């Protein structure tokens, strides 16, 4: 199904407060559409949309759907029995899921840049956004986090350039139309949908095949799974990496806060030197991905350097929240063992006496499928506090719990305890934190509130 952006003028979003859904709604408001939507609770995103003219319902009931709506867009997180979804079907209102609708918007742009990969999508999209803005390309941007330089999670440009994250969950990125497709890495995740890593890799192969012959696949040569991707695409390829690739980083060193300095090479030719403003070795790879795309777009070296230098990070990605009594509070969205290790490595390079970590596992299915990997992810912390699992779209069957995870982590010699609620966690932190410690909250749920509660006492 395709969407007529001239004929259809009233669109309703089920789950309008989501990071991507709110961005799509904002794009339509800017284009003059009548926008309505619903969510289970009010948020900064819903309040922002209301200020821009959207009608937002808190609570999802059938009465929110009226016969004058031209299209209903829904998020994959909603139930098949959602009242609004069922009412839209009864009224024969056309339906699109979020990814399909985003694909329809992408059709209106010539140079779609889709950033995929298990880890690093938000940071790389944000880095690329900073560079293209520095180069005055006036892109439209959709990012999975709040980025200060665009004042939120969406920027509406007036050019052929469109930059977006492309998530592999339920193969949603196969509904996109990339001219440049980035694959940052391939790792085991979303195992509630995919059978195994091979099935995940096959999804990325399909994504690569979406890129037209004149387009580009940009991928990390350090990831051995990319070889199969490259051999299956019919487009130009530019690879990057620390170990190998067309674009590489050499002579890497770090400052006292873990931020990298390195030299960027294309084949054996040095292009320029670069200081990143965000910490962690993983961000070298994210930067190389954004540099590769920038070179394809013929963006000048000065614009690349200035764009990356001015990028200070996105919210919830190694975000320094503040200090209290000499304790630095940092928050990170990491929710996969690989991401957690990268975040802890970055924290290790940050000045600290001890690293005290509060982790909130995200979804029961992920905790079960990656249980062994989670138990080994926290070896570098001085103490770990586990909150209860954040369920997101899932129900607790009793099959897994944070206390089970805690038991196995303790067996590895890590000091760990399971404290269920945030108020009790903060009370415990008040008793153990001392000047010079780093308090690191990690997880994709609402664990950031622990740091905020600690700071705002």
Curated annotation (Swiss-Prot):
One of its GO terms (biological process) is regulation of cell shape. Belongs to the MurCDEF family. Its EC number is 6.3.2.8. It comes from Clostridium kluyveri (strain ATCC 8527 / DSM 555 / NBRC 12016 / NCIMB 10680 / K1). It catalyses: UDP-N-acetyl-alpha-D-muramate + L-alanine + ATP = UDP-N-acetyl-alpha-D-muramoyl-L-alanine + ADP + phosphate + H(+). One of its GO terms (molecular function) is ATP binding. It holds the Pfam family Mur_ligase_M. This is UDP-N-acetylmuramate--L-alanine ligase. The lineage of its organism: Bacteria, Bacillati, Bacillota, Clostridia, Eubacteriales. It is found in: Cytoplasm. Pathway: Cell wall biogenesis; peptidoglycan biosynthesis.
């Amino acid at each position: 199904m395709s969407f007529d952006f001239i004929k259809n003028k009233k669109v309703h979003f089920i789950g309008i407060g989501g990071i991507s859904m709110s961005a799509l709604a904002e794009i339509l408001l800017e284009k003059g559409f009548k926008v309505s939507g619903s969510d289970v609770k009010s948020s900064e995103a819903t309040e922002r949309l209301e200020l821009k003219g959207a009608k937002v319902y808190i609570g999802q009931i059938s009465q929110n759907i009226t016969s004058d709506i031209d299209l209903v867009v829904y998020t994959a997180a909603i139930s098949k029995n959602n009242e609004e979804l069922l009412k839209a079907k009864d009224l024969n209102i056309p339906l699109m899921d979020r990814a399909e609708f985003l694909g329809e918007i992408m059709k209106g742009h010539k140079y779609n840049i889709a950033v995929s990969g298990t880890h690093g999508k938000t940071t790389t999209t944000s880095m690329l956004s900073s560079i293209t803005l520095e180069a005055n390309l006036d892109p439209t941007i959709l990012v999975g986090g709040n980025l200060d330089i665009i004042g939120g999670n969406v920027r509406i440009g007036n050019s052929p350039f469109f930059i977006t994250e492309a998530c592999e969950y339920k193969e949603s990125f196969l509904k996109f139309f990339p001219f440049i497709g980035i694959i940052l890495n391939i790792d085991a995740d979303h195992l509630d949908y995919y059978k195994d890593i091979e099935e995940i890799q096959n999804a990325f192969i399909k994504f690569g095949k979406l890129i037209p012959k004149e387009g580009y696949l940009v991928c990390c040569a350090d990831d051995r799974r990319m070889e199969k991707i490259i051999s299956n695409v019919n487009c130009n390829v530019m690879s990057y990496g620390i170990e190998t690739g067309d674009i590489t980083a050499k002579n890497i060193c770090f400052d006292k806060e873990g931020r990298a300095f390195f030299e960027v090479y294309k084949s054996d030719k040095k292009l320029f030197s670069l200081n990143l403003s965000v910490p962690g070795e993983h961000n070298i790879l994210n930067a190389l991905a954004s540099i590769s795309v920038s070179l394809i777009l013929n963006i000048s070296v000065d614009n690349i350097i200035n764009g990356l230098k001015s990028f200070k990070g996105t919210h919830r990605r190694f975000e320094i929240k503040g200090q209290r009594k000499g304790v630095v509070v940092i928050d990170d969205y990491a929710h996969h063992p690989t991401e957690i290790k990268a975040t802890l490595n970055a924290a290790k390079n940050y000045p600290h006496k001890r690293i005290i970590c509060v982790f909130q596992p995200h979804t029961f299915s992920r905790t079960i499928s990656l249980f062994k990997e989670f138990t080994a992810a926290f070896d570098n912390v001085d103490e770990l506090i586990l909150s209860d699992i954040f369920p997101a779209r899932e129900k607790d069957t009793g099959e897994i719990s944070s206390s089970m995870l805690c038991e196995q982590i303790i067996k590895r010699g890590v000091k760990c305890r399971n404290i269920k609620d945030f108020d009790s966690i903060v009370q415990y932190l008040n008793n153990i934190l001392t000047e010079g410690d780093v308090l690191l909250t990690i997880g994709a749920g609402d664990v950031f509130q622990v740091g905020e509660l600690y700071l705002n006492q």
